[in-house]
Amino acid sequence: MEKRGPKRRQEAAHLSCELCRERKVKCDKLDPCTNCSSAGVICVPVRRPRLPRGAHAQRLRRISPEDPEAPIQIDIASPADAGTIADDDLKERIRRLEALVDSMRSSNHVSKQLIKNFQTNKDQEAQDTIESTLNRIDEDSLLIKGPRVHPSDGGLRILGLSGSSSPETGWASIIEDREVSMQLCQVYLLNVDPVIKILHRPSLEKWMLEGQRYLGLPEGHAAVESLGAAICYVAATSLTETQSWARFHTTKSSIVARARRACETTLEKSSPLLSPDVTTLQAFVLYLVARRSEDPSRAVWTLMAFAVRIAKALDLPRGIDDNFFGQQMRKRLWLAICLLDFQTSLSQPSEPLITVAEATSLFSPPRHINDSDFDPTTSHDIPDREGLTDTTFSLVSHHVQAAGRLLNFEPSVKDDGSRQQHVQNFEQRTLRLLLYCDPESTPYAWFTWHRIQCFVSGARLSAIRPLIHQHGGHPIPILDANEGTSILSLALNILEKVQLVHTDPRGEGFRWFVTVPWQPLAIAISECYICQDRSLVQRAWPIVEAAFQQHEATVSGSSKAISITLERLMCRVRGKLLPSLELSRPGEDLALVTEAPISTSPQKVDPLVFSLDSPLLIAGQEQLLDADQSWAAWEEVIASLHYDETGRADMFLS
């Protein structure tokens, strides 16, 4: 017999991802693949040497059985022999199935439905046999180090409703890897903690960076493990691609996939639906924050109901039996839940689960202090500080969502005077927090400074263009604008501030938190249609185009009605403005505009939301004054979103 030559070790190939292989669909082998991206699930690519198929898999063996890391040696049989074995195996399986079905037909005790089911099973078994014959792989010989990814359960795993009898402990490896968890903790302290102020920074550092026990809880406590995994998950989602490669030498998607599965596994073990620990709820809320950042679907909007119910069951806002430390932790957590409830309700759109009273008058916000001012043993009250503190942005968010609820979800706030008064109160409270704040001192100070300016413009815009649909009533009169200010200018200021965060290096750590809000974008688009100031439109249109493209790329999946409405508006305005803008200012300034794709496919437009055959109101209002035209345009946008009596939508929070 001819002697076999030395075998060359195969290079790792990019194979079908785990989910496509389990679903038995063709994978395009991208990272992430198209199937997983369209399904909204995590794609975990598989890179390993190709393994033999069919009958060859039975001859797979290792050079050294004692060494699991030893390279794989493969004996190759002839293709003809492999085909014969596969055909014989397939025929034998089908023969047994047919015999079983025939014997069941002869039984008088088997129903026709059961026979039908077994016939279906026979066909399915035959198909599965063909697939398994061509793709049979020894699972124990896989060379990938990560665990298997199962199809997404939509978030039910963390609630203990996924039907899994034993959590996959392999996913906890990202937490047990101390170097990785320490790196992710540092990312959390830089990117997440300043804007989502839930935890006590010194206690977190002592636990995850110095190895001490967390708040006296025993090691291995389910609540502590779930919190650690949630911190890693939200930190991973806050990374930019550049930061991911610099810190972990891999893609962001791979880090996020590992961290998310570890978080869901540990949360399932801690049972957030039944746990009386505030720590478990902290982990659950951080999971929702991270999930919302990477997943634009309505999953987080649905899961928010659990978070709100659990928080109320724990009597979170009051916490009268706790010491000062416990009260601050409860208030911070409730504030984060209120903010997340407000944000998720806007993106659908729908009514918030938490009422205006529960979020404002019945709740006193946490202290404006630094984390270093108190510790778990502090029992006395600590007064507020002046200047920028660790909780400044968190308190700004509290005032933002409070003003947003009053202006958009409170039926009693209708007249111009009360709306303007709420805006003034909001400006006074937020600008007071900026006293002695130097925006050039730190990235956090810079981000807080510019976001507050964005929020102030949003509050003024919301007072002028409220989101309450009038349903045939009289529109709210337009407030007098300050000199040099217009509705379009306010909307542009918001869009420019968002773009600034995504382009300035100082905003890199906070880009995950800032997306393009749809309301200023819709107002800017409609105002460009009717604005008579050509120079303002020429300045505004490239900003609007860039914001629209960014919105479509990041949050377009959150609400079909919003996406369709914005796309329809853009098609209308592009058709009117592009010829005149190109004649007036051809060249580089309009490169972004001319390169932007224009989609007018009828199948993408829901007839209940917008009719392709019916013109916009703004197209037929030439006889009206500019103010009436502007209001008519906004009414058309709101009407297109609320054809189903839902009521309201986004204000100015992304």
UniProtKB/Swiss-Prot annotation:
Keywords tagged on the record: DNA-binding, Metal-binding, Nucleus, Transcription, Transcription regulation, Zinc
CDD domains: fungal_TF_MHR, GAL4
DNA-binding region per UniProt: 17-43
Alphabetical GO biological process terms: DNA-templated transcription
Matches recorded under PROSITE patterns: ZN2_CY6_FUNGAL_1, ZN2_CY6_FUNGAL_2
Gene3D superfamilies: Zn(2)-C6 fungal-type DNA-binding domain
Subcellular location per the Swiss-Prot or TrEMBL entry: Nucleus
Any Gene Ontology CC annotation: nucleus
InterPro entries noted in UniProt: Sec_Metabolite_Reg, Transcription_factor_dom_fun, Zn2-C6_fun-type_DNA-bd_sf, Zn2Cys6_DnaBD
Coarse class of the protein's main subcellular location: nucleus
One Pfam assignment: Zn_clus
One function term, GO molecular function aspect: DNA binding
Protein's UniProt keywords contain Nucleotide-binding: no
Task performed by this protein: Transcription factor that specifically regulates the neosartoricin B biosynthesis gene cluster.
Protein name: C6 finger domain transcription factor nscR
Provenance organism: Trichophyton verrucosum (strain HKI 0517)
Gene name as annotated: nscR
